[in-house]
Amino acid sequence: MRKILIFLGLLFVMLSNIYAQKGRQAIGFGLSYVTEIESIGLGLKYQYNITNPIRLEPSLNYFIENDNVSMLDVNMNLHYLCPVGRSVKLYPLFGFTFSNWMYDLGDGFDIDVDGDHIHIDKDDDHHNECRVGVNIGGGADFVLTSNWIMNFELRYQLVSDFDQAVFNLGFAYRF
């Protein structure tokens, strides 16, 4: 019985040490550029390491109006971190996106559900298109201090009729 308790105690200590290496979190912000509406955006992100190399990153970006078009973009991406140096990690990414495109069209009110998007026309001359799509791309993390990282990311959003590249420069605080 004593050997079993010692074994279980050691197993608990080892598993808690392994768990401590996982679960690293970060919260950050970024500046983005999208090619479809040619606009600059501001974003917030949260990062959670499921395992040491696998990271989950939900993010929210708002792209400033350009030629009467603005966009709100919600993403859920998965990164696989590959260290290439002491302070640099490269990662491919795959994820999903929900984007809301807002622009002026004309008068009228209309709601259409067409496959993968919702089309809304309102009486106030604003038009919204909500679409769901897939993100593919990659990025690089650069360690600035023990808690701060900088990243550069390029992803391509495959969204029906709204495919676009997104360039992002961001900073995150790890805790």
Question: Language model features by range: what are they?
Answer:
Residues 1-24:
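Cleavable N-terminal export/targeting peptides
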Residues 3-4, 56, 156:
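Hydrophobic alpha-helical segments, especially transmembrane helices
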Residues 19-56, 60-63, 174:
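Short glycine/proline- and aromatic-enriched beta-strand/turn motifs that initiate or cap beta-hairpins
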Residues 26-29, 117-124, 151-154:
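Extracytoplasmic loops and strand-loop junctions of Gram-negative outer membrane beta-barrel proteins
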Residues 30-42, 63-71, 86, 156-167:
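Solvent-exposed loop/turn segments connecting transmembrane beta-strands
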Residues 32-34, 46, 62-66, 80-82, ...:
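Outer-membrane beta-barrel proteins
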Residues 47-115, 131-132, 142-150, 168, ...:
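Gram-negative (and chloroplast) outer-membrane scaffold detector with strong preference
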